[in-house]
Amino acid sequence: MKEKPYFVHESAYVDEPSSIGAGTKIWHFSHVMKHAVIGEACNLGQNVVVGIGVRVGRGVRVQSNVSLYEGVELGDYVFCGPSCVFTNVVNPRAEISRKDEFRPTRVGRGASIGANATIVCGTTIGSYAFIAAGAVVTRSVVPDYALMGGVPAKRLGWMSRHG
């Protein structure tokens, strides 16, 4: 059997068909669902869920306890801090199916999302934007290089490519 060009911990699951780039590492208790595409040189921490059809760019770092639900797309070199949250329905209800109401979330190249931040679905986060830990992003567009923080998140300043 040919050795895979990526690492998957023995407790993690990767459903087929999916695509995992060379040099990527998928750690303990993580689950990559079918039709997911994960770029080269990514690192998915413990207990990460990558939903059906999710796209993750090259060099992305997803820390532990993050769920990337269907409709999430992460550009190259995005950082997702521990336990940050992406939603996929605006007003979920247990007894009402809302799968036809999923709203996509796009995160641009080099953006950083802090620990425990919440990104409400339907949001586009610009390239190199920085979402502070614990922030709740509810606006539809976060500009490139914006520094966002608070509940709800507001622009606090500007960042550079280098932080």
Language model features: what each stretch is:
Residues 1-7, 13, 46, 55, ...:
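Glycine-rich hexapeptide-repeat left-handed beta-helix
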Residues 1-35, 41, 86:
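Extended, small-residue-rich solenoid/repeat segments and analogous flexible loops
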